[in-house]
């Protein structure tokens, strides 16, 4: 009964359920149907009575009453008059909240154009009428007339006439022979008279005839818009408005401030402007004012409406009283402060608090300490309910009083309320999903939240004043989700790479490391202990120390659960750690019987998690944390200045390097090397010196010393312990403390040639200090900038991947990727095992020798399988990938593989796209914040030689070598590779060897591991001669194409090729070095039938004199490379963004599209033409134009393979896709992005990058439309195209064809099928305009759109609920059909009224 009475006063209208949202252009009739009345006056409210003015912007008659159930004049009050309209003031008696939903309208005296359809590119009005935007604006803003009906005159339709021309035309033809109009009326007439179907047919016909590409583009653009209008049922003339809707007054409130002033929404000012101008125009028309005045007023109305819809889009920005631009309707939606991002995608929530965090080492992993004061406030409603239920209070008011006075029973009840009620803790910035986790609260005194030390890594929290927010999940479902999904004990593994994230750090690591140290000659060495009790006894009586070498018996259980014991050589400390290990046959004492560095601890936790499950792991982690803290405290490790040992050999090493640097200086003075080469060599030498000093220092710090008095080992160096264990500090920082600081970088990224020889212990000189401040400040400035960049990258990634959800179990595709280990400069960077773990095998994996099946296709590759695969020596495995998944919406579980955060196959409904975006974005932010930790010390990244990484036999592919005049073997080929094979003939490693390198091995040689195979100069690119002969110069004209520069400091001259195209006289030159067969210099030597002529590019340094004798393989010229820049994620983050945005790099590589022979064609002024004649006769030759002066490797007649680089550089991803296909592109993007992160030591699983790349490759560009409705150039979803083509083929029609295209993440986000998602991302007005014209329907498939309309997202639990609803709907339909069939129409009707209807909201 109680409920019904309550509902009488506050009737809740049932929320309308809907399945999709449609957006279209509002017709004038629609606007009138929304409106509750016309607004005629610009007044808002009466400033004395505070009552709204009648017919004004806040009129109560139109919009509804100010107070609930009370008319304006006060004649009718209270519920009993509900629904009556007062005859005196005309106000309906109802709830005041209707003022939030009732709209009004303004009748305009002259039509105006809607600025979005006019100006938002491409301008819809101008494209439809096939006029330029300028012309349309001239007509709209009353500058020119436009001919709407030429009649029989010589005027053309749509011709623009100025005032004079119009008058002349009237004089010439007479007023009734033609019609020309001005203003929005003219455009309205033109749009209203358009026959869209006819125009569409004409355009299609014209398209099929035209050949010019430009014309085709223009026609396609216009045809698209015409088709959009036809399909959506919008009329073009609706883009010109005659009535303007006015939004409800409570959405643009007028709030009285104290002192009799008002704060108002900007929209009211903008509406007032429109009404004022419109009323003035009406009056002028009534008074029959002169045309020029009326026209001016009409223009003012148009401008006022423009400002209302989109202030500042055209003309001056309209400002308010305080010179601030007014916020128009568009500004309300746009940007970070707009409706979408401020209120719909992120809301402030109730039941939350924030406070400083402190460490809580005595907590269990699933607990957090919550201050009593906070808990009391957060759980108030629960406390009131419990007080009521227990009979302490009968009303909420009483309960409130009890709580405010903090009665003792309140605390008891608070204890009951929070028991088993998890709370969420969040630390900003929340970069990945581990930034919010659930804990069970433990009440504590004080005002700070206590946080468990092990979850700090996940939150990236420290206790230097960080704050965290607490949220209370209210409903039972929310509590359940918090407990099952978000509890800190359920988030042990990192979603980015599957490694444990709950790993001890800092003090805990130090404590465990200290426990696991072994020392020589400690008391009690060699004793044997049978169990842990004996050991503790011995330790307490100081018979042994923690580090003594002893033998200890360790008990474990075998596979049958029986207890087994084994004797180990170990130390008491290690036995103490081993005691905590869970008993399991798969976990041996060996994982503890080693130095417990952070890496090893992580491996240990991983093992425990994999074999013993989650519960054991959590208990184990808590225990080792306690142990670590307690022993770090007992060890009392600290360090002083004297712990930093400076190596004795430092002076000698520095002196040697100084001598070297002097020698390079001398070589430079003698003209043997250039300025750039000298710089590179000096930087290299100092880099090596720094490393050697650092190595010596490390050796000295690590050294084990014995005390001569006691004969015992001296305690280990504390700094070394901290760094080596991974607790704090790195080798790099130690190097700066006790070695030498080394080379510094300038803010531009160049390295300063003079190094900092001192370290921090010795102290820097003033000069050195100044040099080091240079790089350090850059680091700090970078940090601030890069944080923003990284956050923006994450936002774009989330946006592009948000609808990648696991939606099916198996898509059944036969496609996949081939995985191989990644080798860089002979080092295996990522092993095959790391890359395939947790993926699904595409086909059976067979043993290469015996042929037995190691793993069946379609099975998940687990740790045990990886071990078998690596044992068998398999080098490549085919796996399934999200990239090749064929699920329509989302990804299937088989293609995705293992859920890294759980270690099990991924569940349906998991939002893998968002996880991928977070995994890639989170380290970006982390790294950008870390650039300055090295204090700007430069790290030079470059290699100049190659060493064998395996023993084996050498095989050379595409062998092309010659011996030069010094007797070295020089590589002459472009794609030569050295393979090393092991005894069984299996390829172990492949190295591409660059042109001009010297190699020290030949085919069939046997090499040892670490033997040098080849070396090259990393700073210059050589140009070699392929024949023996005498040098001659061609087109080398002094001052035009060559300059002899004398170095100021040395006076030595060198010849340098300069840009000959800069001078008009040099336009036709082709500088080259030619090799003559004889001394006279007449005949030119031949090589493979072509003349030995070597084209020179700009900045080449000539190494030979004319007439000198050269042998094949000698260097005739060198092209200096960029000096070594330092590599840091600062270069890395923009690189990642560049790859994900699929931008063409500056100076990108040119890739050969076909395999064939190279020919040179006729060059242009500053381009060279290169033609590839394909080996395949059926193909046409392909031409490339290459800027002259760029280094071009090939000579005429060379063979080139498809996919080879004609010009070096970073390839453009689009070219890779077009030439080599999707798989090559995917592996290129994955490897490039991984390389950036690997440099920083960040591990991200490949599958995350693949998910993002999949989203970038969703679209196909239509090339042939066939019998489909597509237009060439349309971008269509590839799976949608496949479905449509299958239908077309089934009907015997011609299918459409297209090429896959790669979209950058921003473009791909804006092209999602959901306009709500796209509008909330970027370019809101453009997206909404486009969607409205084509009458788009958003089916609410992705996550973002559902958040915006306020529903559960279709992932996780929300996805399951949605699925249940779908099944229920199908079941209901079946029951209704059955009832109908059996004649129970009444029952069926009743059921139908109760069933949810599927509606589309407009």
From Swiss-Prot:
Annotated EC: 2.7.7.6
Q: Which SUPFAM superfamilies match?
A: beta and beta-prime subunits of DNA dependent RNA-polymerase (SSF64484)
UniProt keyword Ribonucleoprotein present? no
Q: What cofactors does this protein use?
A: Mg(2+); Zn(2+)
Gene name of the record: rpoC
> Which HAMAP family does UniProt cross-reference here?
RNApol_bact_RpoC
Known InterPro entries for this protein? DNA-dir_RpoC_beta_prime, DNA-dir_RpoC_beta_prime_bact, RNA_pol_asu, RNA_pol_N, RNA_pol_Rpb1_1, RNA_pol_Rpb1_3, RNA_pol_Rpb1_3_sf, RNA_pol_Rpb1_4
Similarity comment: family membership: Belongs to the RNA polymerase beta' chain family.
Give the reactions, separated by semicolons, that this protein catalyses. RNA(n) + a ribonucleoside 5'-triphosphate = RNA(n+1) + diphosphate
Binding positions for Mg(2+)? 462, 464, 466
Q: A Gene Ontology MF term for this entry?
A: magnesium ion binding
Q: Binding of Zn(2+) 2: at which residues? A: 811, 885, 892, 895
Instruction: Please list the GO biological process terms of this entry.
Output: DNA-templated transcription
- Binding residue positions for Zn(2+) 1: 71, 73, 86, 89
Subunit-level organization: The RNAP catalytic core consists of 2 alpha, 1 beta, 1 beta' and 1 omega subunit. When a sigma factor is associated with the core the holoenzyme is formed, which can initiate transcription.
Q: How is the cofactor bound?
A: Binds 1 Mg(2+) ion per subunit.
Establish whether keyword ATP-binding is in the entry: no
Functionally, this protein is described as follows: DNA-dependent RNA polymerase catalyzes the transcription of DNA into RNA using the four ribonucleoside triphosphates as substrates.
CDD domains xref list: RNAP_beta'_C (cd02655), RNAP_beta'_N (cd01609)
Q: What is this protein called?
A: DNA-directed RNA polymerase subunit beta'
Any single GO CC term annotated in Swiss-Prot or TrEMBL for this entry:
DNA-directed RNA polymerase complex
Q: Which UniProt keywords apply?
A: DNA-directed RNA polymerase, Magnesium, Metal-binding, Nucleotidyltransferase, Transcription, Transferase, Zinc
Q: Which domain of life is it from?
A: Bacteria
Task: Name the Gene3D superfamilies on file.
Answer: 1.10.132.30, 1.10.150.390, 1.10.1790.20, 1.10.40.90, 2.40.40.20, 2.40.50.100, RNA polymerase II, clamp domain (4.10.860.120), RNA polymerase Rpb1, domain 3 (1.10.274.100)
Q: What is the organism field in this record? A: Bartonella henselae (strain ATCC 49882 / DSM 28221 / CCUG 30454 / Houston 1) (Rochalimaea henselae)
